[in-house]
Amino acid sequence: MQTLVIIGNGMAANRVLEELGINHQYDAIQVIGDEHIPHYNRIMLSPLLANETTLEAITPHDDAWYQERRIEVILGDGVKAVNVQAQQVETNSGRALPYSDLVFATGSRSFIPPVDGADHPAVIGFRTMSDVDAMVEKFGNLKHATVIGAGLLGVEAAVGLKLRGVDVTLLHRNPVLMNRQLDATASSILEASLAERGIDVRTGTSPVRLHGNSDAIQKIEIKSKRGEETLDTQLVVFATGIAPNIELAVDAGITTQRGICVNEQMKTCTPGIYALGECCEFDNQTYGLVAPIWDQAKVLAAILKSNDDTAPYKERTHLTKLKVSGLDMHSIGEYEASEGGDVIATEDLSEGVYRKLVLRENKIVGVLCVGDVTDSHWYYELMSDGADISSIRDMLIFGQAYCEQAA
Protein backbone atom coordinates (compact mmCIF):
# COMPACT_ATOMS: atom_id res chain seq x y z
CA MET A 1 0.00 0.00 0.00
CA GLN A 2 1.43 3.34 -1.07
CA THR A 3 0.91 5.98 1.62
CA LEU A 4 2.06 9.58 1.66
CA VAL A 5 2.29 11.23 5.08
CA ILE A 6 2.68 15.00 5.32
CA ILE A 7 3.67 16.57 8.64
CA GLY A 8 2.06 19.99 8.71
CA ASN A 9 -1.24 21.36 7.43
CA GLY A 10 -0.19 24.82 6.35
CA MET A 11 0.10 26.48 2.97
CA ALA A 12 3.09 24.44 1.80
CA ALA A 13 1.40 21.12 2.56
CA ASN A 14 -1.85 22.07 0.89
CA ARG A 15 -0.11 23.46 -2.16
CA VAL A 16 1.53 20.06 -2.64
CA LEU A 17 -1.90 18.42 -2.38
CA GLU A 18 -3.27 20.79 -5.00
CA GLU A 19 -0.34 20.08 -7.32
CA LEU A 20 -0.73 16.30 -6.87
CA GLY A 21 -4.34 16.51 -8.06
CA ILE A 22 -7.01 13.84 -7.89
CA ASN A 23 -5.25 11.18 -9.96
CA HIS A 24 -2.22 10.65 -7.76
CA GLN A 25 -0.72 7.20 -7.29
CA TYR A 26 -1.17 6.91 -3.53
CA ASP A 27 -3.70 4.60 -1.93
CA ALA A 28 -3.96 7.10 0.90
CA ILE A 29 -2.57 10.46 1.96
CA GLN A 30 -2.49 11.49 5.61
CA VAL A 31 -1.91 15.10 6.64
CA ILE A 32 -1.13 15.83 10.28
CA GLY A 33 -1.83 19.30 11.66
CA ASP A 34 -1.42 20.40 15.25
CA GLU A 35 -4.04 23.15 14.89
CA HIS A 36 -7.64 22.15 15.61
CA ILE A 37 -9.11 23.91 12.57
CA PRO A 38 -8.87 23.05 8.86
CA HIS A 39 -6.22 24.55 6.61
CA TYR A 40 -6.60 28.29 6.02
CA ASN A 41 -4.79 30.88 3.93
CA ARG A 42 -2.22 32.40 6.29
CA ILE A 43 -1.56 35.23 3.85
CA MET A 44 -5.00 36.55 4.79
CA LEU A 45 -4.39 36.73 8.55
CA SER A 46 -3.80 40.48 8.31
CA PRO A 47 -7.19 41.22 6.68
CA LEU A 48 -8.74 38.80 9.17
CA LEU A 49 -7.21 40.71 12.09
CA ALA A 50 -8.50 43.94 10.54
CA ASN A 51 -12.00 42.40 10.37
CA GLU A 52 -11.98 42.71 6.57
CA THR A 53 -12.63 39.01 5.99
CA THR A 54 -13.72 35.85 7.83
CA LEU A 55 -12.14 32.51 8.64
CA GLU A 56 -14.67 30.79 6.41
CA ALA A 57 -13.67 33.00 3.49
CA ILE A 58 -9.98 32.12 3.85
CA THR A 59 -10.58 28.36 4.22
CA PRO A 60 -10.13 27.12 0.63
CA HIS A 61 -11.16 23.46 0.81
CA ASP A 62 -14.15 21.62 2.26
CA ASP A 63 -14.30 18.00 3.45
CA ALA A 64 -15.43 16.76 0.03
CA TRP A 65 -12.30 18.17 -1.60
CA TYR A 66 -10.10 16.03 0.63
CA GLN A 67 -12.29 12.95 0.40
CA GLU A 68 -12.25 12.80 -3.39
CA ARG A 69 -8.46 12.92 -3.24
CA ARG A 70 -8.21 10.11 -0.66
CA ILE A 71 -6.77 12.47 1.93
CA GLU A 72 -7.25 12.06 5.66
CA VAL A 73 -6.58 15.25 7.60
CA ILE A 74 -5.68 14.67 11.25
CA LEU A 75 -6.33 17.86 13.21
CA GLY A 76 -5.17 18.84 16.68
CA ASP A 77 -2.60 16.06 16.88
CA GLY A 78 1.06 16.91 16.40
CA VAL A 79 3.85 14.47 15.64
CA LYS A 80 5.84 13.07 18.53
CA ALA A 81 8.55 11.23 16.60
CA VAL A 82 9.61 9.94 13.19
CA ASN A 83 11.07 6.43 13.04
CA VAL A 84 13.11 6.40 9.85
CA GLN A 85 14.07 2.73 10.09
CA ALA A 86 10.48 1.57 10.53
CA GLN A 87 9.15 4.24 8.11
CA GLN A 88 6.58 5.27 10.68
CA VAL A 89 5.32 8.47 12.26
CA GLU A 90 4.07 8.53 15.86
CA THR A 91 1.56 11.21 16.80
CA ASN A 92 1.04 12.79 20.21
CA SER A 93 -2.21 10.86 20.62
CA GLY A 94 -0.40 7.57 20.09
CA ARG A 95 -1.30 6.83 16.48
CA ALA A 96 1.36 5.01 14.46
CA LEU A 97 1.26 5.98 10.79
CA PRO A 98 3.38 3.99 8.32
CA TYR A 99 4.54 5.84 5.22
CA SER A 100 5.98 5.12 1.81
CA ASP A 101 6.93 8.76 1.33
CA LEU A 102 7.17 11.40 4.05
CA VAL A 103 7.05 15.18 3.63
CA PHE A 104 8.11 17.68 6.27
CA ALA A 105 5.98 20.81 5.90
CA THR A 106 6.34 21.85 9.52
CA GLY A 107 6.70 25.56 8.79
CA SER A 108 8.19 27.98 11.27
CA ARG A 109 7.43 29.78 14.49
CA SER A 110 7.85 33.40 15.51
CA PHE A 111 11.37 34.25 16.60
CA ILE A 112 11.20 36.04 19.94
CA PRO A 113 14.46 37.88 20.70
CA PRO A 114 16.05 37.59 24.16
CA VAL A 115 14.31 40.60 25.70
CA ASP A 116 13.77 40.62 29.45
CA GLY A 117 10.14 39.61 30.05
CA ALA A 118 9.52 38.40 26.49
CA ASP A 119 8.81 34.91 27.83
CA HIS A 120 5.59 36.21 29.41
CA PRO A 121 2.64 34.02 28.32
CA ALA A 122 0.75 37.11 27.13
CA VAL A 123 3.41 37.89 24.50
CA ILE A 124 2.10 37.03 21.03
CA GLY A 125 3.63 36.30 17.63
CA PHE A 126 1.75 36.78 14.37
CA ARG A 127 1.86 33.48 12.53
CA THR A 128 -1.32 31.51 13.19
CA MET A 129 -5.06 31.76 13.68
CA SER A 130 -4.51 31.24 17.39
CA ASP A 131 -2.34 34.38 17.42
CA VAL A 132 -5.19 36.35 15.85
CA ASP A 133 -7.67 34.83 18.31
CA ALA A 134 -5.41 35.79 21.22
CA MET A 135 -5.35 39.41 20.04
CA VAL A 136 -9.10 39.55 19.41
CA GLU A 137 -9.83 38.13 22.87
CA LYS A 138 -8.03 41.09 24.43
CA PHE A 139 -9.92 43.77 22.48
CA GLY A 140 -12.52 44.37 25.19
CA ASN A 141 -9.94 45.69 27.66
CA LEU A 142 -7.25 46.68 25.19
CA LYS A 143 -6.30 50.33 24.90
CA HIS A 144 -2.77 50.13 23.59
CA ALA A 145 -0.71 47.55 21.71
CA THR A 146 2.99 47.53 20.90
CA VAL A 147 4.17 45.78 17.75
CA ILE A 148 7.89 45.02 17.68
CA GLY A 149 9.39 44.72 14.22
CA ALA A 150 8.30 46.72 11.15
CA GLY A 151 8.93 44.15 8.49
CA LEU A 152 6.08 42.98 6.29
CA LEU A 153 4.19 41.16 9.06
CA GLY A 154 4.77 43.83 11.68
CA VAL A 155 3.35 46.59 9.49
CA GLU A 156 0.34 44.44 8.64
CA ALA A 157 -0.25 43.61 12.31
CA ALA A 158 -0.02 47.27 13.34
CA VAL A 159 -2.53 48.35 10.69
CA GLY A 160 -4.89 45.49 11.54
CA LEU A 161 -4.89 46.40 15.23
CA LYS A 162 -5.43 50.08 14.45
CA LEU A 163 -8.40 49.26 12.24
CA ARG A 164 -9.87 47.46 15.25
CA GLY A 165 -9.73 50.70 17.23
CA VAL A 166 -6.59 49.97 19.24
CA ASP A 167 -3.87 52.58 19.77
CA VAL A 168 -0.65 51.15 18.34
CA THR A 169 3.05 51.88 18.72
CA LEU A 170 5.24 50.23 16.08
CA LEU A 171 8.89 49.75 17.06
CA HIS A 172 11.66 49.03 14.58
CA ARG A 173 15.36 48.76 15.34
CA ASN A 174 16.43 49.79 11.84
CA PRO A 175 15.93 53.41 10.71
CA VAL A 176 14.23 52.08 7.55
CA LEU A 177 10.85 50.34 7.76
CA MET A 178 10.60 47.03 5.89
CA ASN A 179 14.33 47.36 5.36
CA ARG A 180 14.56 44.07 3.47
CA GLN A 181 12.25 45.43 0.76
CA LEU A 182 12.36 49.25 0.90
CA ASP A 183 14.90 52.04 0.64
CA ALA A 184 14.84 55.19 2.77
CA THR A 185 12.52 57.12 0.44
CA ALA A 186 9.93 54.35 0.24
CA SER A 187 10.20 53.90 3.99
CA SER A 188 9.47 57.58 4.58
CA ILE A 189 6.30 57.33 2.49
CA LEU A 190 5.22 54.24 4.42
CA GLU A 191 5.96 55.92 7.74
CA ALA A 192 3.91 58.97 6.76
CA SER A 193 1.02 56.76 5.69
CA LEU A 194 1.09 54.86 8.97
CA ALA A 195 1.22 58.12 10.91
CA GLU A 196 -1.85 59.35 9.02
CA ARG A 197 -3.65 56.27 10.29
CA GLY A 198 -2.73 57.22 13.84
CA ILE A 199 0.03 54.65 14.33
CA ASP A 200 2.95 55.84 16.46
CA VAL A 201 6.03 54.73 14.51
CA ARG A 202 9.39 54.60 16.32
CA THR A 203 12.38 53.74 14.13
CA GLY A 204 15.84 53.18 15.58
CA THR A 205 14.09 51.86 18.67
CA SER A 206 14.43 48.55 20.52
CA PRO A 207 12.56 46.91 23.40
CA VAL A 208 14.52 46.64 26.65
CA ARG A 209 12.15 45.08 29.16
CA LEU A 210 8.52 43.99 29.51
CA HIS A 211 6.63 44.41 32.77
CA GLY A 212 3.42 42.73 33.89
CA ASN A 213 1.70 40.48 36.37
CA SER A 214 0.93 36.80 35.91
CA ASP A 215 -2.05 37.56 33.68
CA ALA A 216 -1.12 40.50 31.51
CA ILE A 217 1.55 42.81 30.13
CA GLN A 218 1.36 46.29 31.64
CA LYS A 219 4.40 48.26 30.45
CA ILE A 220 7.30 48.08 28.03
CA GLU A 221 10.64 49.84 28.34
CA ILE A 222 12.15 50.98 25.05
CA LYS A 223 15.46 52.51 24.04
CA SER A 224 16.37 54.84 21.19
CA LYS A 225 18.82 57.66 20.46
CA ARG A 226 16.56 59.85 22.57
CA GLY A 227 17.17 57.61 25.57
CA GLU A 228 14.97 55.19 27.46
CA GLU A 229 11.21 55.50 27.80
CA THR A 230 8.39 53.45 29.34
CA LEU A 231 5.07 52.94 27.55
CA ASP A 232 1.82 51.72 29.07
CA THR A 233 0.67 48.81 26.93
CA GLN A 234 -1.58 45.80 27.33
CA LEU A 235 -0.46 43.77 24.32
CA VAL A 236 2.97 43.06 22.85
CA VAL A 237 3.24 41.45 19.42
CA PHE A 238 6.64 40.30 18.18
CA ALA A 239 7.13 40.32 14.41
CA THR A 240 10.90 39.95 14.51
CA GLY A 241 11.43 37.06 12.14
CA ILE A 242 10.88 33.32 12.12
CA ALA A 243 12.66 30.14 13.17
CA PRO A 244 12.17 26.96 11.08
CA ASN A 245 10.58 24.03 12.92
CA ILE A 246 13.29 21.39 12.50
CA GLU A 247 13.25 19.57 15.85
CA LEU A 248 11.50 16.44 14.56
CA ALA A 249 13.98 16.14 11.72
CA VAL A 250 16.93 16.60 14.08
CA ASP A 251 15.63 13.86 16.38
CA ALA A 252 15.12 11.57 13.38
CA GLY A 253 18.73 12.02 12.25
CA ILE A 254 17.89 13.98 9.11
CA THR A 255 20.50 16.55 8.08
CA THR A 256 19.66 20.08 9.16
CA GLN A 257 21.35 23.46 9.44
CA ARG A 258 19.06 26.43 9.98
CA GLY A 259 16.40 24.42 8.16
CA ILE A 260 15.93 20.85 6.94
CA CYS A 261 18.48 20.51 4.15
CA VAL A 262 17.07 19.61 0.72
CA ASN A 263 18.40 19.36 -2.81
CA GLU A 264 16.89 20.78 -6.00
CA GLN A 265 14.25 18.02 -5.97
CA MET A 266 13.24 18.82 -2.37
CA LYS A 267 14.79 15.54 -1.20
CA THR A 268 16.47 15.30 2.19
CA CYS A 269 19.52 13.15 2.84
CA THR A 270 17.19 10.28 3.82
CA PRO A 271 15.56 8.31 0.97
CA GLY A 272 11.81 8.75 0.74
CA ILE A 273 11.78 11.87 2.94
CA TYR A 274 11.24 15.37 1.58
CA ALA A 275 10.81 18.89 2.94
CA LEU A 276 9.54 22.21 1.66
CA GLY A 277 8.41 25.61 2.81
CA GLU A 278 9.54 27.57 5.83
CA CYS A 279 11.06 24.51 7.52
CA CYS A 280 13.48 23.71 4.70
CA GLU A 281 16.84 25.04 3.60
CA PHE A 282 18.11 24.97 0.03
CA ASP A 283 21.51 26.26 -1.01
CA ASN A 284 21.94 27.98 2.38
CA GLN A 285 18.61 29.80 1.97
CA THR A 286 15.53 29.59 4.19
CA TYR A 287 12.12 30.97 3.30
CA GLY A 288 9.49 33.32 4.68
CA LEU A 289 7.52 34.39 1.60
CA VAL A 290 4.94 32.30 -0.19
CA ALA A 291 6.08 32.62 -3.82
CA PRO A 292 9.19 30.38 -3.59
CA ILE A 293 7.17 27.85 -1.60
CA TRP A 294 4.74 27.57 -4.52
CA ASP A 295 7.70 26.79 -6.78
CA GLN A 296 8.91 24.15 -4.33
CA ALA A 297 5.46 22.54 -4.15
CA LYS A 298 5.28 22.23 -7.92
CA VAL A 299 8.67 20.53 -8.06
CA LEU A 300 7.93 18.22 -5.14
CA ALA A 301 4.55 17.12 -6.49
CA ALA A 302 6.17 16.18 -9.80
CA ILE A 303 8.89 14.22 -7.99
CA LEU A 304 6.32 12.40 -5.84
CA LYS A 305 4.53 11.43 -9.05
CA SER A 306 7.81 9.73 -10.07
CA ASN A 307 8.68 12.36 -12.64
CA ASP A 308 12.39 12.61 -11.93
CA ASP A 309 12.86 14.55 -15.16
CA THR A 310 10.94 17.53 -13.81
CA ALA A 311 12.69 20.88 -13.83
CA PRO A 312 14.65 21.23 -10.56
CA TYR A 313 13.88 23.90 -8.02
CA LYS A 314 15.82 27.10 -8.65
CA GLU A 315 16.04 30.33 -6.73
CA ARG A 316 14.44 33.24 -8.54
CA THR A 317 13.43 36.77 -7.70
CA HIS A 318 9.85 37.27 -6.54
CA LEU A 319 7.53 40.23 -6.17
CA THR A 320 6.77 41.26 -2.58
CA LYS A 321 3.50 43.06 -1.88
CA LEU A 322 2.45 44.93 1.23
CA LYS A 323 -0.98 43.43 1.98
CA VAL A 324 -2.67 46.40 3.65
CA SER A 325 -5.71 48.06 2.10
CA GLY A 326 -4.89 51.59 1.02
CA LEU A 327 -1.12 50.99 1.08
CA ASP A 328 0.17 49.86 -2.31
CA MET A 329 3.82 48.83 -2.27
CA HIS A 330 5.60 46.36 -4.53
CA SER A 331 9.27 45.44 -4.19
CA ILE A 332 11.26 43.20 -6.52
CA GLY A 333 14.92 42.25 -6.37
CA GLU A 334 17.58 44.84 -5.55
CA TYR A 335 16.21 48.00 -4.00
CA GLU A 336 19.65 49.64 -3.71
CA ALA A 337 22.16 49.87 -6.55
CA SER A 338 25.28 47.82 -5.90
CA GLU A 339 28.52 48.04 -7.87
CA GLY A 340 27.85 48.49 -11.56
CA GLY A 341 24.21 49.38 -11.05
CA ASP A 342 22.32 52.48 -12.16
CA VAL A 343 19.17 53.99 -10.69
CA ILE A 344 16.25 55.64 -12.47
CA ALA A 345 13.65 57.13 -10.15
CA THR A 346 10.70 59.46 -10.06
CA GLU A 347 8.74 60.64 -7.07
CA ASP A 348 5.86 62.81 -5.93
CA LEU A 349 6.14 62.61 -2.18
CA SER A 350 3.16 64.94 -1.66
CA GLU A 351 1.00 62.27 -3.31
CA GLY A 352 2.87 59.36 -1.77
CA VAL A 353 4.05 58.10 -5.15
CA TYR A 354 7.55 56.77 -5.79
CA ARG A 355 9.00 54.59 -8.51
CA LYS A 356 12.56 53.32 -8.68
CA LEU A 357 14.32 50.99 -11.10
CA VAL A 358 17.76 49.51 -10.52
CA LEU A 359 19.54 48.61 -13.75
CA ARG A 360 22.70 46.72 -14.56
CA GLU A 361 24.03 46.12 -18.07
CA ASN A 362 20.76 47.41 -19.54
CA LYS A 363 18.66 44.92 -17.60
CA ILE A 364 16.28 45.51 -14.71
CA VAL A 365 17.57 43.98 -11.48
CA GLY A 366 15.34 45.79 -9.00
CA VAL A 367 11.97 47.55 -8.81
CA LEU A 368 10.24 49.65 -6.16
CA CYS A 369 6.72 50.93 -6.78
CA VAL A 370 4.95 52.88 -4.05
CA GLY A 371 1.52 54.46 -4.29
CA ASP A 372 1.12 53.59 -7.98
CA VAL A 373 1.91 49.93 -8.69
CA THR A 374 0.28 49.83 -12.13
CA ASP A 375 3.44 48.80 -13.96
CA SER A 376 5.11 46.60 -11.36
CA HIS A 377 4.09 43.32 -13.03
CA TRP A 378 5.34 44.56 -16.40
CA TYR A 379 8.67 45.47 -14.86
CA TYR A 380 8.74 42.05 -13.20
CA GLU A 381 8.21 40.33 -16.55
CA LEU A 382 11.02 42.33 -18.14
CA MET A 383 13.25 41.50 -15.20
CA SER A 384 12.39 37.78 -15.18
CA ASP A 385 12.96 37.53 -18.94
CA GLY A 386 16.31 39.29 -18.68
CA ALA A 387 15.12 41.72 -21.35
CA ASP A 388 17.54 44.28 -22.79
CA ILE A 389 15.85 47.62 -22.12
CA SER A 390 18.42 49.85 -23.84
CA SER A 391 15.96 50.91 -26.56
CA ILE A 392 13.40 52.16 -24.02
CA ARG A 393 15.75 53.11 -21.21
CA ASP A 394 14.91 56.83 -21.29
CA MET A 395 11.16 56.12 -21.16
CA LEU A 396 11.16 53.06 -18.94
CA ILE A 397 10.41 54.85 -15.69
CA PHE A 398 7.10 56.16 -17.12
CA GLY A 399 5.66 52.68 -17.55
CA GLN A 400 4.38 50.24 -20.14
CA ALA A 401 1.69 52.39 -21.77
CA TYR A 402 4.08 55.30 -22.30
CA CYS A 403 6.77 53.05 -23.78
CA GLU A 404 4.32 51.32 -26.14
CA GLN A 405 2.81 54.64 -27.25
CA ALA A 406 6.25 56.09 -27.96
CA ALA A 407 7.43 53.02 -29.87
For every predicted segment, state its role.
Residues 11, 36, 108-110, 130, ...:
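Residue-level detector of alpha-helix initiation sites
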Residues 106-164:
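Glycine-rich dinucleotide-binding loop and its adjacent helix/turn
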